[in-house]
Structure formats: structure tokens, C-alpha cells
A protein has these predicted regions:
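Central antiparallel beta-sheet cores of small beta-barrel/beta-sandwich binding domains
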Residues: 1-87, 114-116, 120
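Edge beta-strand at a domain terminus
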Residues: 44, 91-124
Length: 124
């Protein structure tokens, strides 16, 4: 079981990450909302036990190849979850928060929360 690799979630978004000494780096390609490739940075348990590896990573929704800032370019998401083998498949089970800038009067609209399940894509 290894966190590094290529992962696909239920929406068809692709995340490609490397992990070195517990540090996660990579890219997240979204196919919902604003399309593009985005930076991923995070941390993982460097010595997982018990068939589960915990991790957390952030995605900055400013496209890696952006020249002009769009409205989503100021959004950031934080994902937390575990890598486990579920029904014979390596699976990332995550919960995420997305925050976007608002006025103080609209702060209640600034954070969204949901779950996302990723399956390994780079192993047949």
C-alpha cells in the first residue's frame, strides 16, 4: 500500500502525487467547475500502521498555468483522510473543506464541506 501515485475520484478528477519523508506534492486536475491543473501540498504519516495511512493535503485552486486570475483562483481546499484497502482496492477516503473569500456579512457562505473517494488509477 503506497500513497504516491495517480488517483481518480468519483467526479473523474485526477490527482497525481509523490510522497517523500511524509511530504506530499503533486497536481490535481479537476473536471468539475473550473477545469485545469492545480497544486497539491500536504503531509502523510511516514510510518503507517494497521493497514491504514493518514494524510492531509491542500489544493490551491489557482491553475498551474494561469495567466489571469479568475474567481476560483482565490479558493483553497483542505482534504484529510486515510489510505486503506477496501474491497480489494486501494482507496483514499477523504473529507474536504473549501473556502472562498467573502465579505464579513457573507462569511456563512464561505466554507463548503463534502467527502470524496479516490481509487488508484496507475495500477492495473
Amino acid at each position: 500500500m503506497q500513497l504516491a501515485g495517480v488517483w481518480e475520484n468519483e467526479h473523474g478528477s485526477i490527482m497525481e502525487i509523490t510522497v517523500q519523508d511524509g511530504k506530499i506534492e503533486g497536481s490535481y486536475s479537476s473536471y468539475t467547475g473550473d477545469k485545469g491543473a492545480y497544486r497539491v501540498l500536504g503531509l502523510a504519516d511516514p510510518e503507517p500502521i494497521g493497514g491504514s495511512q493518514t494524510f492531509a493535503f491542500a489544493v490551491s485552486w489557482r491553475p498551474l498555468d494561469a495567466h489571469d486570475a479568475g474567481s476560483g483562483d482565490h479558493w483553497v481546499s483542505g482534504f484529510v483522510g486515510q489510505l486503506q484497502v477496501i474491497d480489494g482496492e486501494e482507496t483514499l477516503t477523504t473529507m474536504w473543506l473549501l473556502t472562498k473569500p467573502t465579505t464579513p456579512e457573507e462569511n456563512w457562505t464561505s466554507i463548503l464541506i463534502d467527502k470524496s473517494i479516490f481509487k488508484r488509477r496507475d495500477r492495473g
